Amino acid sequence: DPLRAKFIAENFLEDAVCFNEVRNMFGYTGTYKGERISVMGTGMGMPSISIYARELIVDYGVKKLIRVGTAGSLNENVHVRELVLAQAAATNSNIIRNDWPQYDFPQIASFNLLDKAYHIAKNFGMTTHVGNVLSSDEKYSNYFEKNIELGKWGVKAVEMEAAALYYLAAQHQVDALAIMTISDSLVNPDEDTTAEERQNTFTDMMKVGLETLIAD
């Protein structure tokens, strides 16, 4: 979300400068506790994040990438506003299978970032879940019941970008992690949040992401 990047820059970074406005995909560089940090929107879905993440890695030499965004719960024990750290990302997309047609290439987080983020979140007292997520090509899937079934297999949530991010990180040997806030629930329909809340109030994941990037 480009407006989420703007929110992070305005509320967490010092001396933030906008370095990109092309396609309204705002990007900012500033400092957080003395460390230079960049934040940028990546659009919606795996094709979009694949473009921006690859350019950040290949053209700008970025070595650590953390996605902060929203996800829908697939598990009755994972509730709105709680955090999910994606240890791994299953996917129904063919993006990866186009490269590896005879393999199920596992999309996993950087353990270094995952371990740091988990302990930082717990030290903050945030309710945090670690496990598998589903990266889907469709927000409004025709396979709703199938996705719900994944929750019974321990999949925490569904989102649209983590698998592609982890795949690019593996390809280019850099570190990546996806930190999501649960914005709604597929198993508890009464749990929901507004668009404004999603843009401006999901600050826990932002704090964890920033602290993880500067942790020793």
Swiss-Prot record:
Enzyme class, broadest EC rank: transferase
Record's keyword terms, sorted: Glycosyltransferase, Transferase
Domain of life, per lineage: Bacteria
GO molecular function: purine-nucleoside phosphorylase activity
This protein's GO CC annotations: cytosol
Pfam family, one: PNP_UDP_1
Residues annotated to bind phosphate: 4, 23, 67-70
Catalytic activity, reaction form: a purine D-ribonucleoside + phosphate = a purine nucleobase + alpha-D-ribose 1-phosphate; a purine 2'-deoxy-D-ribonucleoside + phosphate = a purine nucleobase + 2-deoxy-alpha-D-ribose 1-phosphate
Residues binding a purine D-ribonucleoside: 159-161, 183-184
Transferase keyword on record: yes
EC number: 2.4.2.1
Residues annotated as the enzyme's active site: 184 (proton donor)
One GO term of the biological process aspect: purine nucleoside catabolic process
Site (Important for catalytic activity): 198
Subunit description: Homohexamer; trimer of homodimers.
Family: Belongs to the PNP/UDP phosphorylase family.
Task performed by this protein: Catalyzes the reversible phosphorolytic breakdown of the N-glycosidic bond in the beta-(deoxy)ribonucleoside molecules, with the formation of the corresponding free purine bases and pentose-1-phosphate.
NCBIfam families: deoD, PRK05819.1
Annotated protein name in UniProt: Purine nucleoside phosphorylase DeoD-type
Gene this protein is translated from: deoD
